[in-house]
């Protein structure tokens, strides 16, 4: 197992490139869309990218050994107006994996998620050697949960869901 995550493994502010969305850029979050843009689009939204992002490797399918460009998984639409959640954070993909050979923790993590998790991948990939992300709502791959746990050498499973949003797809994925 991976053991306990040491305090020294928690990334610090200086480990990231920080920026604020808002101010000169309008940020249209999902909640604002749902409420017909009733909220300000000028709020400051923190955005951080690991300083070593160029050293991270992104994979789109289980078992892939050829990495894909970061923009395949993480939005790159900061030049849009307004900027949306998908322009800044990860897309709602059924599966992706991020490898960080220089991570302070050698653990491999599986995240079962909905869109609530999209903003956290850069932070988590700065900590763990491997972060495998599955969104059961759009997961189209062959490996079931047990196979993923084995194939990716998972040490830790995390659930990232909006409050009260446990989906039928998650239950089916866990039951398969």
Predicted regions and their residues:
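Extracellular glycan-modifying ectodomains
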Residues: 1-176
């Amino acid at each position: 197992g991976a053991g306990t995550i040491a305090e020294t493994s928690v990334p610090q502010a200086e480990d990231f490139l920080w920026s604020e969305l808002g101010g000169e850029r309008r940020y249209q979050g999902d909640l604002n869309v749902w409420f017909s843009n009733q909220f300000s689009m000028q709020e400051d939204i923190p955005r951080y990218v690991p300083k070593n992002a160029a050293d991270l490797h992104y994979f789109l399918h289980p078992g892939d050994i050829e990495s894909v460009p970061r923009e395949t998984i993480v939005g790159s639409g900061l030049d849009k107006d307004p900027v949306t959640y998908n322009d800044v954070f990860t897309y709602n993909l059924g599966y992706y994996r991020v490898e960080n050979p220089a991570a302070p923790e050698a653990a491999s993590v599986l995240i079962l998620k909905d869109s609530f998790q999209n903003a956290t991948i850069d932070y988590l990939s700065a900590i763990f050697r491997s972060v495998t992300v599955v969104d059961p709502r759009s997961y189209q791959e062959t490996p079931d949960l047990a196979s993923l746990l084995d194939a990716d050498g998972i040490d830790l499973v995390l659930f990232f869901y909006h409050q009260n949003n446990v989906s039928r797809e998650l239950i089916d994925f866990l039951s398969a």
